[in-house]
């Protein structure tokens, strides 16, 4: 039988990245946290944490963390229901937090609008980890989140992968810059395009390379780049003429400050909702809301 206090200490150390911050969060002494972690590791017969500047979970620790979070969520559902029943449904349910990993474009364009009614109705809090869609599954694997919007189609261990649809991206630039990328006949010149900077969300963002590979046959092309890791600022940089970039087509509706560099040329990113196979009632509601929102806003695949 796992000790609840040891699990609490373990979860806090991973969440806060160290023994000291975990001790402060739990209002315990540092030695007390260390003793609980050592007892947990000794009891299970393996290391659960990698000690370093920022403490992180081992593979075994990641599996244990996912278990701990699943149990915590299910307990929160049960306690919330019991309290509501004891109060005769007279009082509001306690707020419950759900951790998810999502790419920034999805958060801005369809995820939040789609799940907002659910969050308000069931008093759910979101703890969102923003990462590139090709990397969000790392947070699920580590046990940090209960679900993620990902490009990974194969279900991870202990998880379910459900298709959501595709986000369609278009290569755009400010009208003046788009014109500079074309020849006198109006044809796009890839050499002219690559002479201008691309606006890229962060160093994990590979959409620009995907566009160049898909439509020009270029592999690992060299071109200047701006890195702008914020959605509003990213789009503003393109609209201001700082460079060209890939923007979801939903974000282009009604805009006149950006136009397609190569009209009709798109990149589709197929997305999946990866989540724990063993879900609490609240997590199940979120899964259904995510799927419904995706069906409304994403392209079918």
Predicted regions and their residues:
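Short helix-boundary/capping micro-motifs
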Residues: 11-27
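Central regulatory/effector-binding core of bacterial HTH transcription factors
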Residues: 93-157
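Hydrophobic/proline-rich hinge and linker segments of small-molecule sensing/allosteric domains
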Residues: 160-203, 270-278
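Secondary-structure junction motif
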Residues: 194-218
């Amino acid at each position: 039988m796992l000790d609840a206090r040891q699990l609490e200490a373990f979860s806090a150390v991973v969440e806060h990245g160290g023994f000291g911050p975990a001790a402060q969060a739990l209002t315990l002494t540092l030695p007390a946290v260390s003793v609980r972690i050592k007892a947990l590791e000794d009891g299970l017969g393996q290391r659960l944490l990698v000690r370093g500047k920022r403490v992180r979970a081992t593979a075994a620790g990641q599996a244990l963390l996912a278990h701990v979070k699943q149990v915590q969520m299910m307990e929160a559902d049960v306690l919330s229901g019991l309290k509501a029943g004891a109060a005769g449904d007279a009082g509001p349910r306690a707020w419950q937090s759900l951790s998810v990993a999502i790419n920034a474009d999805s958060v801005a364009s369809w995820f939040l609008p789609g799940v907002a009614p659910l969050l308000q109705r069931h008093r759910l809090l979101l703890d969102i980890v923003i990462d590139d869609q090709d990397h969000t599954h790392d947070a699920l694997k580590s046990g940090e989140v209960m679900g993620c919007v990902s490009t990974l189609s194969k279900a991870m261990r202990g998880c379910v992968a459900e298709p959501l649809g595709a986000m369609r991206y278009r290569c755009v630039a400010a009208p003046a810059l788009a014109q500079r990328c074309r020849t006198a006949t109006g044809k796009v010149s890839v050499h002219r395009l690559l002479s201008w900077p691309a606006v890229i969300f962060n160093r994990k963002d590979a959409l620009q390379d995907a566009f160049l590979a898909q439509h020009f046959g270029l592999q690992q092309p060299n071109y200047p780049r701006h890195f702008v890791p914020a959605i509003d600022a990213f789009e503003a940089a393109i609209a201001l003429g700082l460079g060209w970039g890939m923007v979801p087509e939903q974000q282009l509706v009604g805009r006149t400050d950006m136009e397609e560099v190569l009209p009709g040329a798109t990149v589709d990113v197929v997305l999946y909702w990866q989540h724990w196979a063993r879900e609490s009632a609240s997590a199940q509601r979120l899964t259904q809301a995510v799927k419904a929102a995706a069906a409304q806003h994403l392209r079918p695949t």
